[in-house]
Amino acid sequence: MDFRHSEEQLAFYKSVHDFAAGVVEPGAHERDVEGRFDRDLWSKLGDFGLLGLPVPERYGGSGADIITTCLALEALAEGGHDAGLGLSVGAHVTIGTVPIWLHGNEEQKKYLPRLTTGEHIGAMAITEPEAGSDAASIKCRATRDGDDWILNGSKIFITNGSIADTVIVMAVTDPEAGPGHGVSAFIVERGTSGFSVGRDLDKMGTRSSPLSLLHFDDCRVPHANLLGTEGSALWAIAFECFDWERTVMIASSVGGMKASLRASIAYAKERVAFGKPIAHQQAIQHKLADMKAHLDAARLLLYRAAWLKQEGLPHQTEASVAKLFVADAAMRNAVEGTQIFGGYGYIKEYPIERSMRDAKLISIGGGTSEIQKMIIARGLLEEH
């Protein structure tokens, strides 16, 4: 079993890390404080080739495999110290762009070149005020009217919602089909009549990425914008893309864990207490050791899940195991890092404070930790 990445992948990781350190990290603190998404920075990510990684080159992407895509998001997080930006990139790629690549017809794939270059931003709208973890209970309706569909309903907690140029909207087209069935996906463009942004939500962490409330009031969408097969979108499109989302999402978390550990080591060597650097204190050494163990285990679980998906092998349980563990490990490391920094870890001038607020998202977004446990248990019971 070879755990090494290829020389090309390692060189790519370094190039993304260095780019992020030089372009993304400056201003990360200010973007967090202001809760501001930076469109100019987004364009630079597009120019660097980070916004269409897995999409084939003929559509403007890089044709990268999922492992390389994860490496890019890990490096972006480690070098850039901006979890919000990483969240927006991950959502744009995995649930805003990949569904059009995998399920769109050739006419619909006209959206891809603008998405992969960063000219446009993508999002997916599933969650509703009364349908979060229970995605099968969505109420947003789409009714056929000649060559159009009329959408009515609201969506909440939509990453990139207020900045997206295209939103893939899940809506019920056959209410008689039962929960989880009769759901279709529609590509809705910014500016479509009846589509509006309610407001952006004020978040604890990942604050440079907008999280939005969206409204669809008699929103008329052409039938040509129906993505995939009518009535099968929740299972065929959404749940498939959740595998992409969860894996890439935790890659960003692993990159953040690496950055926190490095910062904690550096601070422990510099901070003097009782006449010597606190790195000489066994209590601090134990915290650093725990952080390293959590990081290495998280990274191995991440790339096991990514490798299984890349090889076309069963991976849903392993992806949920990885997300469940990384959610806990990222939070534990953020707490330990903050404790090492002491009082300085509690003030906003130091990135370690931001890491704790950012880390909490992983146990909630993209499927809560409780949902991951349900998926894992279901897989175990089916296997045995």
Positions of the model-derived regions?
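A short core secondary-structure module
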Residues: 152-197
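Short Ser/Thr-interspersed hydrophobic loop/turn segments at strand-loop and sheet-helix junctions
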Residues: 49, 73-77, 171, 188-193, ...
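Alpha-helical interface subdomain recognition
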Residues: 1-83, 103-107, 118-119, 144-149, ...
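Long, acidic (Asp/Glu-rich), low-complexity accessory segments flanking structured domains
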Residues: 217-236
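Short Gly/Pro-enriched turn/cap motifs at secondary-structure boundaries
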Residues: 89, 115, 130-133, 157-160, ...
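N-terminal glycine-rich flavin-associated loop
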Residues: 84-106, 132
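A short, Trp-centered hydrophobic/proline-enriched beta-strand micro-motif
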Residues: 118-126, 170
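Flexible, small-/acidic-enriched active-site or ligand-binding loops
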Residues: 137-139, 191-220
